[in-house]
Regions:
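Redox-cofactor binding/interface segments in oxidoreductases and associated redox assembly factors
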Residues: 65-69, 95
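Walker A (P-loop) phosphate-binding motif
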Residues: 128-172
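Glycine-rich, highly charged phosphate/nucleotide-binding loops
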Residues: 43-57, 70-80
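Short internal beta-strands
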Residues: 34-39, 94-97
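Extreme N-terminal, non-catalytic leader segments
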Residues: 82-140
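Short, small-residue-enriched loops and turns at beta-alpha junctions
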Residues: 70-75, 100-102, 127, 148-150, ...
């Protein structure tokens, strides 16, 4: 379980679209999105309070979320100092990038030294069985599309919100990185 509340790391995102992970979390879970941290040159802004890492720690933030989806899904060299500083301040870090936090030697060592968690949401520790086609109880609404960034998750979260407002039992089941971070 990813510890809450979150500080959304936007790094040096070149535009608002690059911060789509952070934007999704802020839009759908504003209660756990305490603030944002941006590096010089960042062109994205979620409209949240800008924090330093120290301010965020004092405000009770538990996890720094990499809120950027960049080309190639890599950790920019300009981000590493901030991410290492976060680990030294005992923040957990969560990321949905293709490059894994746990594959970065420096992050892994600092997390171990400071007893922090690294959450690579692209990797699961759960072994999911292959579907068998047998009828199951309950009802499901599958949201599918032909491309990314077309609104599948936002639509599904809006359906969940409306059903819950009508006191209909509903749970959002994430399949992508942003959805997993929204779900926690």
């Amino acid at each position: 379980m990813i510890n809450k509340p979150y500080l959304l790391f936007l790094g040096d995102a070149p535009d608002q679209l690059a911060a789509k992970v952070g934007q999704g979390i802020k839009d759908w879970r504003p209660d756990i999105s305490l603030g944002q941290i941006r590096l010089p040159g960042c062109k994205a802004d979620l409209g949240l309070r800008d924090y330093t890492l120290e301010e965020a720690k004092n405000a009770g933030v538990k996890t720094l979320i990499v809120g950027v989806a960049n080309r190639g899904g890599t950790f920019s060299s300009t981000w590493k100092e901030t991410l290492c500083q976060a680990l030294n301040l005992k923040f957990d870090i969560a990321s949905g990038l293709h490059n894994l936090l746990s594959d970065e030697k420096e992050f892994k060592e600092l997390a171990s030294l400071n007893q922090c968690n690294l959450f690579d949401v692209r990797v699961t520790s759960t072994n999911f069985p292959i579907a068998n086609g047998k009828k199951r109880s309950g009802k499901r609404c599958l949201t599918i599309g032909t491309d990314c960034s077309v609104g599948k998750m936002y639509s599904t979260l809006a359906i969940e919100r409306e059903m819950l407002s009508r006191e209909i039992k509903a749970t959002f089941r994430a399949t992508g990185q942003t959805g997993i971070l929204i779900s926690g």
